[in-house]
C-alpha cells in the first residue's frame, strides 16, 4: 500500500513540475471533471493544452496512479471472493518444453491481475423505512436551524476548497452565533413592517405588537411617548455597579403606564394574517442593510420572487362560488 502512495506522490510531483505556472488551472479542471461538469475528453484536451508534447506522459501517469490507488482502496483482500482460475498455470502433457517461458510469464500475469467476482464489491441492499432515515437533510427540508455538526462539516468542505487544512472550534462557534443573529435581524425587519414597536436608546426595537397604541388626535399622547424613561424598576438596595438615577421608581413607572393607557386609542389594532413571502420581500427591499452582500441579496430576492403567488380573477371567482355553495348547504342543514 505504501508503494502505491509513494507512486502517486511521485506522479503528482512530476506533473506539478511539468505544469509549472499552469498547475492551478490543471487542478481546477480536475475538480470540474470530478464534479462531472466537464467530460473526460474535455479534461484531456485542456491537459494537453497546458502541457508540452514531451510532458504529456506525466498527465497519463498521474491518472493511472490515481486509478491504481482507488482500486487498491476498494479491492478486497487477496484470495477473498476470487473466482477459480483453471487455465494456463499447469503444464499440459505432450507439449514441448519450450513453452515453459510463456508459462512463467502467464503465472506472473495471473498473480498481478487476478479475476474478481463482480458481486463481491457490490453494496449490500438493505430496505429502510423512510421514517427511520437519518441522512443529512437541508434546513429547507427540516425547517430548523442547522446544527453545529452540519455547520462544521460545511466549513470543513469550504476550508478544503480554499487550501486550508482544518477548522477550529472557535470559528464554528462564531459562525453559529452569526447565523442566529442574522436570522434575528431578518425577523426583526419583517415584524417591524407589520407591527408597531418602541425604540430604546435610539436604535433598539422592542415591544412589538403592543396593545397600547397612541391616539393621534391627542396632543399629550405624542409627548407621553416621546418622554418615556425605559428601564427596569429600581431595586430597594441597588448594587455598587448600578446607577440608581438611571432606573425609574416603581410609583413613577405605574404613573407613566397609566398616563400612556389614558392617551392611547380605544380600539385595538386589527389582527394580521400570518407572515408570507410578500412581507419578507417588502422587508428586504426596505431594509437593504440586513443582507449587506449584494450577491447573497440578489440570489435570495430571486428565490423569493419565484415563490410569490397570488390568486387570479378566475380563482377568486371559483372561491366565491364555493363559499356561496357552502353557505347554501349550511342554510339547508339549519332548516
UniProtKB/Swiss-Prot annotation:
One of its GO terms (cellular component) is nucleus. PANTHER family: TRANSCRIPTIONAL ADAPTER 1 (PTHR21277:SF5). Belongs to the TADA1 family. The keyword Transcription applies. CDD domains: HFD_TADA1. It is found in: Nucleus. Keywords: Nucleus, Transcription, Transcription regulation. The keyword Transcription applies. Component of the STAGA transcription coactivator-HAT complex, at least composed of SUPT3H, GCN5L2, TAF5L, TAF6L, SUPT7L, TADA3L, TAD1L, TAF10, TAF12, TRRAP and TAF9. This is Transcriptional adapter 1. One of its GO terms (molecular function) is transcription coactivator activity. Probably involved in transcriptional regulation. GO terms for biological process: regulation of transcription by RNA polymerase II.
Amino acid at each position: 500500500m505504501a508503494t502505491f502512495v509513494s507512486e502517486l506522490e511521485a506522479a503528482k510531483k512530476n506533473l506539478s513540475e511539468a505544469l509549472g505556472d499552469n498547475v492551478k488551472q490543471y487542478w481546477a479542471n480536475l475538480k470540474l471533471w470530478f464534479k462531472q461538469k466537464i467530460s473526460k475528453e474535455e479534461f484531456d484536451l485542456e491537459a494537453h493544452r497546458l502541457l508540452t508534447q514531451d510532458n504529456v506522459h506525466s498527465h497519463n501517469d498521474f491518472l493511472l496512479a490515481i486509478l491504481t490507488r482507488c482500486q487498491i482502496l476498494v479491492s478486497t483482500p487477496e484470495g477473498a471472493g476470487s473466482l477459480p482460475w483453471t487455465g494456463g498455470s499447469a503444464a499440459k502433457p505432450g507439449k514441448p518444453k519450450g513453452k515453459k517461458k510463456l508459462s512463467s510469464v502467464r503465472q506472473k500475469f495471473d498473480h498481478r491481475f487476478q479475476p474478481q467476482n463482480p458481486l463481491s464489491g457490490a453494496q449490500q441492499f438493505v430496505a429502510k423505512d423512510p421514517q427511520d432515515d437519518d441522512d443529512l437533510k437541508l434546513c429547507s427540508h427540516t425547517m430548523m436551524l442547522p446544527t453545529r455538526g452540519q455547520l462544521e462539516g460545511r466549513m470543513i468542505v469550504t476550508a478544503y476548497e480554499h487550501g486550508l487544512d482544518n477548522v477550529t472550534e472557535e470559528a464554528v462557534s462564531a459562525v453559529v452565533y452569526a447565523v442566529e443573529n442574522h436570522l434575528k435581524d431578518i425577523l426583526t425587519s419583517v415584524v417591524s413592517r407589520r407591527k408597531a414597536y418602541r425604540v430604546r436608546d435610539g436604535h433598539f426595537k422592542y415591544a412589538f405588537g403592543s396593545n397600547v397604541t397612541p391616539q393621534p388626535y391627542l396632543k399629550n399622547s405624542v409627548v407621553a411617548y416621546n418622554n418615556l424613561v425605559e428601564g427596569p424598576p429600581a431595586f430597594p438596595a441597588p448594587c455598587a455597579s448600578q446607577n440608581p438615577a438611571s432606573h425609574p421608581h416603581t410609583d413613577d413607572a405605574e404613573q407613566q403606564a397609566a398616563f400612556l393607557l389614558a392617551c392611547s386609542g380605544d380600539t385595538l389594532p386589527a389582527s394580521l394574517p400570518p407572515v408570507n413571502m410578500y412581507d419578507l420581500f417588502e422587508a428586504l427591499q426596505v431594509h437593504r442593510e440586513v443582507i449587506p452582500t449584494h450577491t447573497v441579496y440578489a440570489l435570495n430576492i430571486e428565490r423569493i420572487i419565484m415563490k410569490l403567488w397570488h390568486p387570479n380573477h378566475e380563482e377568486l371567482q371559483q372561491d366565491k362560488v364555493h363559499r356561496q355553495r357552502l353557505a347554501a348547504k349550511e342554510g339547508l342543514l339549519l332548516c
